[in-house]
């Protein structure tokens, strides 16, 4: 071989014999391999870019668990852009034509990204395990900052393990033993070293992750059984028999979905708010100029809570609002409410008649701009509409009362007194937490299964080649190695299949609907109607 790696030729009796590119494959083979690998690479890139964009644009996805998935997507994106395409070129040409430096850089990037994927899966497995088995102690420490530290350590360990050895081994031993037309890790030329790295990089992590997942599954099933027993005992209480509406109220307090655009357009209102102390002094609140309201009263942003599908056959309950106070940050979500926390609000209802007799009120801020120094503190409130004696000001605004969900509604002729059973509330809360844990465990199981299926063939061939060097055909080596890359293609599909939020966000991004959705929501929540 010539010393200059950029001259693609060998010499026979001093005469250069140039290699013909793609000489080892027929034309149809080249076209087929190139087309298939190009499609897989494109799907990998698009899928993992969608994961990153989804994490950026959808705040619902910014959870601690999804930080680990974001890190995994970064590793998969590197593999989709660089590893897949360079390895395909290497296969089609039958030789490495980019030189030793490019070879070492590619191998370092490839092995660091692949090992980072394994490390991220380990971190996700331990995170799920501790979240299930130590919910009180571990979850208090489970913060985005801590997740960032763990992700950084996963990448740092992967870099330290592979990059220095791949790039510097030839200098440590004093020479490069890898032929110029080949690209492989020099220190893995010994079968025993290859065997050891396969054990450390694949078999041990897979064994640990499998054990952790089995324990996660067993603990989740145990908690599901305990919760079912608790729900069974709770459902036979007399309070539940007499007041079936309790379940609907508690569910409404926990869920506050945003209305659809059509509902928003039908139910836009303008409003102003004042403290209850103003009305108790005998002076009814009046709708005033928005600037005056902003100076004298805390502004509210609300969304109406509609009953879920499982509540449709139950008696209608009072609407529940999620209220965001624009305040100086003195309040906190954990504060206890008293009767003084009730709000009396003038709303100008522009609702249409629906099947239910209870009107739906959508309240918008009086002004689009708020002082930057103010903070948002979220509370959940119940909207109580008085049927008799409802006051109306000269602008046609009706007075309604907003009560905290935790504050019982006074028994008035026009309202239903709802006082949820505390034990039932606890059961509901436990069920919601358990549902989230089960979804996270399902995502982990899908990712882990995909990892085992795609990585096992290659690592089995590594073990076989240790004892029988010529037993594995070159074609199988290529397929096994490429199958490891396919894991990066499958991971985003697993996220979409197991996580509804990912799936919906992917769909909106692919259909270019996300920007339109954001604009509509911004217009709605800022309020597109002004006070008269």
From Swiss-Prot:
Compartment(s) of residence: Cell membrane; Postsynaptic cell membrane
Pfam families cross-referenced by the UniProt entry: 7tm_1
Disulfide cysteine pairs (residue numbers): 103-183
Glycosylation sites: 8
Residues bearing the modification Phosphothreonine: 501, 505
Keywords: Cell membrane, Disulfide bond, G-protein coupled receptor, Glycoprotein, Membrane, Phosphoprotein, Postsynaptic cell membrane, Receptor, Synapse, Transducer, Transmembrane, Transmembrane helix
Region annotation Disordered: where it falls in the sequence: 262-365
Side of membrane Cytoplasmic, spans: 54-66, 127-146, 215-443, 499-532
Topological type in the membrane: Multi-pass membrane protein
GO biological process: adenylate cyclase-inhibiting G protein-coupled acetylcholine receptor signaling pathway; chemical synaptic transmission; dopamine transport; G protein-coupled receptor signaling pathway, coupled to cyclic nucleotide second messenger; gastric acid secretion; transmission of nerve impulse
Domain of life: Eukaryota
Topological domain spans for side Extracellular: 1-29, 88-104, 170-191, 465-478
GO molecular function ontology, one term from the record: G protein-coupled acetylcholine receptor activity
GO CC annotations, alphabetized: dendrite; plasma membrane; postsynaptic membrane; synapse
Entries under SUPFAM superfamilies matching the protein: Family A G protein-coupled receptor-like (SSF81321)
Chain intervals with Polar residues compositional bias: 282-308
Protein family (similarity comment): Belongs to the G-protein coupled receptor 1 family. Muscarinic acetylcholine receptor subfamily. CHRM5 sub-subfamily.
Function: The muscarinic acetylcholine receptor mediates various cellular responses, including inhibition of adenylate cyclase, breakdown of phosphoinositides and modulation of potassium channels through the action of G proteins. Primary transducing effect is Pi turnover.
PANTHER family (alphabetical): 5-HYDROXYTRYPTAMINE RECEPTOR, MUSCARINIC ACETYLCHOLINE RECEPTOR M5
Protein name, per record: Muscarinic acetylcholine receptor M5
Source species of the chain: Macaca mulatta
């Amino acid at each position: 071989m010539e010393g200059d790696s950029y001259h693609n030729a060998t010499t026979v009796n001093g005469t250069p014999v140039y290699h013909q590119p793609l000489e080892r494959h027929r034309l149809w083979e080249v076209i087929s391999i190139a087309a298939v690998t190009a499609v897989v690479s494109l799907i990998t890139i698009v899928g993992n870019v969608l994961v990153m964009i989804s994490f950026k644009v959808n705040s619902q996805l910014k959870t601690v668990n999804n930080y680990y998935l974001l890190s995994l997507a970064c590793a998969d994106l590197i593999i989709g852009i660089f590893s897949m395409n360079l390895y395909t070129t290497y296969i089609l040409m039958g030789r490495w034509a980019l030189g030793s430096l490019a070879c070492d850089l590619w191998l370092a990037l490839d092995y660091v990204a692949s090992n980072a994927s394994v490390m991220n899966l380990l971190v996700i497995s331990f995170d799920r395990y501790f979240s299930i088995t130590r919910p009180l102690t571990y979850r208090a420490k489970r913060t985005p900052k801590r997740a960032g530290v763990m992700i950084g350590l996963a990448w740092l360990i992967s870099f330290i393990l592979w990059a220095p050895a791949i790039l510097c081994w030839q200098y440590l031993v004093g020479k490069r033993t890898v032929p110029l037309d080949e690209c492989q890790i020099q220190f893995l030329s010994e079968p025993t070293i290859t065997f050891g790295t396969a054990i450390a990089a694949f078999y041990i992590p897979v064994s640990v992750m499998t054990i952790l997942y089995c324990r996660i599954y067993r603990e989740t099933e145990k908690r599901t059984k305990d919760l079912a027993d608790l729900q069974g005992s709770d459902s036979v209480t007399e309070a539940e028999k007499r007041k079936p509406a309790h379940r609907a109220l508690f569910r409404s307090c926990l869920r506050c979905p945003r209305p659809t655009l059509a509902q928003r357009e039908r139910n836009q209102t303008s409003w102003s708010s004042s403290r209850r102390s103003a009305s108790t002094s005998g002076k009814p609140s009046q709708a005033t100029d928005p600037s005056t309201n902003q100076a004298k009263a805390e502004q509210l942003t609300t969304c109406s809570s509609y009953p879920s599908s499982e509540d449709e056959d139950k008696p209608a309950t009072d609407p529940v609002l999620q209220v965001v106070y624009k305040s100086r940050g003195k309040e906190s979500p954990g504060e206890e409410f008293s009767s003084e926390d009730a709000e009396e609000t003038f709303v100008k209802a522009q609702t249409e008649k629906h099947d239910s007799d209870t009107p739906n009120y959508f309240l918008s801020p009086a002004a689009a701009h708020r002082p930057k120094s103010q903070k948002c503190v979220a509370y959940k409130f119940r909207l109580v509409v008085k049927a008799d004696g409802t006051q109306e000001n000269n602008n046609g605004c009706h007075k309604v009362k907003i009560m905290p969900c935790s504050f019982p509604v006074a028994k008035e002729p026009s309202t239903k007194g709802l006082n949820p059973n505390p034990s039932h509330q606890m059961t509901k809360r436990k069920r919601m937490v358990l549902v989230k844990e089960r979804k996270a465990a399902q995502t982990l199981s899908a990712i882990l299964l995909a990892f085992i299926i795609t990585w096992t063939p290659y690592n089995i061939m590594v073990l076989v080649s240790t004892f029988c060097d010529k037993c594995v055909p070159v074609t199988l080596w290529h397929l096994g190695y490429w199958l490891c890359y396919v894991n990066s293609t499958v991971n985003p599909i697993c996220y979409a299949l197991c996580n509804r939020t990912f799936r919906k966000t992917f769909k909106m991004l692919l259909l270019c609907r996300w920007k339109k959705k954001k604009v509509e929501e911004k217009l709605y929540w800022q309020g597109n109607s002004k006070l008269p």
